[in-house]
Amino acid sequence: MTALNHTPLNAAHRALNARMVDFGGWDMPVNYGSQIEEHEAVRTDAGMFDVSHMCVVDFTGSRVRAFFEHAIANNVGKLKTPGKALYSCLLNPQGGVIDDLIVYYFTEEFFRVVVNAGTAEKDIAWFNQLNEQGGFGVTITPRRDFAIVAVQGPNAREKAWSTVPAARAATSELKPFNAAQVAGTPFGDLTVARTGYTGEDGFEVIVPAVHVEALWNALQQNGVRPCGLGARDTLRLEAGMNLYGQDMDDTVSPLDAGLAWTVDLTAPRDFVGRAALEANGTRAAFVGLILQKENGKAGGVLRAHQKVVTPHGEGEITSGTFSPSMQESIAFARVPAAVQIGDLVQVQIRDKNLPARVVKLPFVRNGKVLAA
């Protein structure tokens, strides 16, 4: 049996009596006692997540921009100011999603990318292959010397500033999907990004691994609640945010995973997967579902891989959960393209077909329920 990977915060999680699970080969906390309370902390105050299993990768060289114009589906031409971030898919030639990632632009010769844990080695190998084939001459450096802490919630930024006062000046005017580099803090040189995976405001902080436990402890002392993967999943699902490997993978087009907004076909770029996307177009709708109640009760919980029956053919739930914010069973589903918002469909739960309503994503954003 292969030993699990540990983040630099593993001992801190265990000291907090976290319930640990194998998450894609990483020993990670699923909760610290109450997943619901952790979820609520992020929606109403401030919570923090260890996301150090994700991998920071630095790209340097004179042709970094040209490399990303070819490598990713979104358009790095949008990255003009230092610190600007871009969410994109990394595609294979068939138009399938190898990974979803965030690209940060700092200078014309320095871009930084954060990739998912389970796909990191595959991504880096693919980047190296594209770099070599295209003769871009880019230096690609995985940075396992970094850890990442996500501080999320309506009070997250204030509590982060209380913990790292030096970050306030550099980040107080930071707009969403932008990052700043903050040098000389007690926790080393930081990259602080106004990004997240919860539907709430906050920061994702890239910190030297040797300092991350001190930062984690200081944030906790300033009232930021440690949160595990369980709350992270319910929060991201409410927020309408995809999970790689569940809502899309290398056999699924971003156009069929609710990610058409991350694909830029307007610029004349020959990016990997473009020809396949243009040839195939959109084949399915990616929608939200809310399980309908009878006599005030739902007959089950929506879960991944349940079959969705519609008048236009069958679909499948990709992610599902019970929403703490809505007190409803919610899901993402890939369904025939003719399915419309507001339609009623049937979901096969055990031996029953139960009604669910099709809604526009997201369900919740900034603490407000949007899907009724």
UniProtKB/Swiss-Prot annotation:
Record GO terms (molecular function): aminomethyltransferase activity; transaminase activity
Enzyme class: transferase
One of the GO BP terms on file: glycine decarboxylation via glycine cleavage system
Enzyme Commission number, as recorded: 2.1.2.10
Gene Ontology CC terms: cytosol; glycine cleavage complex
InterPro entries found in the cross-reference section: GCS_T, GCS_T_bac, GCST_C, GCV_T_N, GcvT/YgfZ/DmdA, GcvT/YgfZ_C, TrmE/GcvT_dom1
Name of a matching Pfam family: GCV_T_C
Organism superkingdom: Bacteria
Catalytic activity, as annotated: N(6)-[(R)-S(8)-aminomethyldihydrolipoyl]-L-lysyl-[protein] + (6S)-5,6,7,8-tetrahydrofolate = N(6)-[(R)-dihydrolipoyl]-L-lysyl-[protein] + (6R)-5,10-methylene-5,6,7,8-tetrahydrofolate + NH4(+)
Keywords for the protein's UniProt record, in alphabetical order: Aminotransferase, Transferase
Quaternary structure, from the entry: The glycine cleavage system is composed of four proteins: P, T, L and H.
PANTHER family on file: AMINOMETHYLTRANSFERASE, AMINOMETHYLTRANSFERASE, MITOCHONDRIAL
Family: Belongs to the GcvT family.
HAMAP family associated with the record: GcvT
Summary of the function given for this chain in its UniProt record: The glycine cleavage system catalyzes the degradation of glycine.
Protein name in the entry: Aminomethyltransferase
Species of provenance: Burkholderia lata (strain ATCC 17760 / DSM 23089 / LMG 22485 / NCIMB 9086 / R18194 / 383)
